[in-house]
Amino acid sequence: GGHLMKVSKEAMKDMYLRMVHIREFESKAQSLFADGKIPGFVHLYLGEEAVATGVCACLRDDDYITSTHRGHGHIVAKGGDLKFMMAELFGKATGYCKGKGGSMHIADRDKGILGANGIVGAGHNIAVGAGLSASYRGTDQVCVCFFGDASTNQGTFHESLNMAAIW
């Protein structure tokens, strides 16, 4: 049999609340986009809340993540601010990227969120670079690269695996 990780009730409650926050944020974004109130595009993370929450629950604040065009859930799970995120979706200067990044380009380096990316497969090499940086600096930080299956046929996926394997 496998080994089960013991998770405290407090940690389980925190993970549950993060999943709820992701679902509520995405549901609100979906509604506002459908009503034509959010400009541009919105790619949702509905139904995948547990993935980002479980992964990010194992990370420290100084660990890194890279994300995809469906990155809202990753940002929330890593501790992103919902108000800054929604402001970014609306193109407001109070958003994470001063309203210039929109839904697919949210970043918060202070929280280790190296950015979501609208280009399929563009986060792989950024994640490897963050991992290599941690290694060179002698820290025990990690970088998690969230990606979808469509990105595995991109050159950056294979190049990043190769780079990670050889250093």
Annotated model-derived regions:
Residues 13-16:
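Hydrophobic alpha-helical segments at protein termini of multi-pass membrane proteins
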Residues 1-4:
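Short, Lys/Arg-enriched N-terminal segments with co-localized hydrophobic residues
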Residues 6-11:
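Structural motif
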Residues 27-30, 37-167:
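Cofactor-binding active-site loop characterized by glycine-rich and histidine/acidic residues
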